[in-house]
């Protein structure tokens, strides 16, 4: 309720500054190895991560109304692709640096060094935040605690449909990357720690490709057709993980890198399309409240469902059933469940309302007409 009156930029700046305080325990815990018991170390880490994510979640409620206010609607797709590219480049180099620094057998003080590096880069990011202009809050947000009732927000049909997509997508994403790492490190054909990090970095390269792919398409074609494309790609990715965890496809480093690459492309395509659709769907009146609910629903699902998925995976530890040429174990069942969640997401995307969305056949025609292979064959 206070974001609009407090100011979008100010809310982000204060939130991002406070969250850095909780990086300090993450720096200290590895250095206390041998001085405090593992249970206390785990409690400190969980507490610090909880507070870090809580503050980040509160501050993030100002992010969407802020960028919606300063980025014109006609170029939001281009902005989001550039933002995604910057994020993927930074994440790629950070993960590569971590892989090279940690090596195969990391020791506790190395993790302290990584967290200290994160703290420094977080402080640097505040300088860039300071340079971004603020967006004026809507008059209703600035003067009233509750310009729109929560019941009216829920009854806003286009937003409610979008909220379902956000919620089910968060169910899919909750813990996914962590559980993939667990499979790659403990499953059959397990990879060394540094190779898992190198393979994980491939998803950021895949995400970077969206800069070329979506730069003009997101504004021209709309979000819905691109969301369907991303869901189809991610469905194939889940089929690959099912095959690997079920023993049908070998777990090889080059194959894993390829799957991560395609997965990164699918993630970024869907997320950017969903974000642009949210910015177009939320009305100007009470937009801080709409975006707050949107952020909270996604954050809660992303926070709760890793626990539920983890309980499911642990409960299936002893399951090993051969059927349809696959070994159905804890991971192959988990990836199959995610495939079902993707289908549910596609059903909800079908219900979403978008005024200027192209049809799927128009997307296919655009892909055939505007692709590098066609230009190369003309030469």
Task: Give the location of each predicted region.
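Juxtamembrane helix-start motifs in multi-pass secondary transporters
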Residues: 11-12, 114, 223-229, 334
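Substrate-agnostic recognition of the 12-TM MFS/MFS-like secondary transporter fold
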Residues: 1-11, 15-20, 44, 48-134, ...
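C-terminal ends and interior cores of transmembrane alpha-helices
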Residues: 15-39, 232-250
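Multi-pass alpha-helical transporter architecture, strongest
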Residues: 29-31, 121-133, 241-244, 331-379
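C-terminal transmembrane helical hairpin of 12-TM major facilitator-type secondary transporters
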Residues: 225-271
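Short amphipathic helix-loop junctions that connect adjacent transmembrane helices
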Residues: 178-196, 314
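Juxtamembrane/transmembrane-helix interface segments of polytopic membrane transporters
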Residues: 30, 34, 95-103, 181, ...
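Juxtamembrane intracellular "pre-TM" segments in multi-pass secondary transporters
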Residues: 135-164, 359-379
């Amino acid at each position: 309720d206070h974001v609009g009156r407090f100011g979008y930029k100010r809310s982000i700046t204060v939130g991002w500054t406070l969250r850095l305080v909780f990086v300090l325990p993450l720096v200290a815990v590895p250095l206390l190895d041998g001085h405090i018991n593992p249970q206390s170390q785990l409690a400190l880490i969980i507490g610090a991560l909880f507070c870090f994510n809580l503050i980040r979640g509160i501050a993030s409620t100002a992010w969407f109304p802020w960028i919606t206010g300063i980025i014109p609607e006609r170029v939001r797709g281009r902005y989001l692709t550039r933002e995604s590219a910057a994020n993927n480049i930074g994440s790629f180099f950070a993960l590569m640096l971590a892989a090279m620094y940690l090596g195969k057998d990391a020791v506790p003080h190395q993790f302290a060094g990584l967290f200290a590096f994160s703290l420094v880069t977080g402080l640097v990011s505040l300088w860039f935040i300071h340079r971004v202009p603020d967006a004026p809050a809507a008059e209703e947000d600035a003067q009233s605690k509750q310009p729109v009732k929560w019941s009216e927000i829920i009854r806003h049909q286009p937003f409610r449909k979008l909220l379902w997509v956000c919620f089910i997508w968060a169910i899919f994403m909750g813990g996914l990357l962590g559980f993939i790492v667990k499979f790659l490190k403990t499953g059959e054909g397990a990879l060394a720690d540094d190779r898992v990090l190198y393979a994980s970095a491939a998803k950021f390269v895949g995400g970077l490709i969206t800069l070329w792919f979506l730069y003009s398409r997101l504004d021209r074609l709309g979000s819905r057709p691109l969301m369907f494309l991303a869901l189809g790609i991610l469905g194939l990715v889940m089929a690959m993980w099912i095959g690997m965890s079920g023993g049908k496809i070998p777990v090889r480093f080059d194959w894993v890198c390829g799957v991560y690459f395609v997965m990164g492309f699918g993630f970024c395509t869907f997320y950017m399309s969903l974000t642009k659709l949210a910015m177009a769907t939320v009305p100007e009146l009470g937009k801080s409240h709409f975006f707050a609910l949107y952020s909270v629903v996604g954050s809660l699902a992303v926070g709760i469902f890793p626990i539920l998925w983890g309980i499911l995976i642990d409960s299936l530890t002893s399951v090993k059933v051969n059927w349809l040429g696959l070994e159905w174990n804890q991971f192959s069942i988990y990836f199959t469940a995610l495939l079902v969640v993707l289908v549910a997401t596609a059903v909800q995307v079908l219900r979403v309302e978008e005024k200027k969305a192209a049809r799927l056949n128009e997307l296919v025609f655009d892909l055939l007409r505007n692709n590098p292979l066609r230009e190369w064959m003309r030469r």
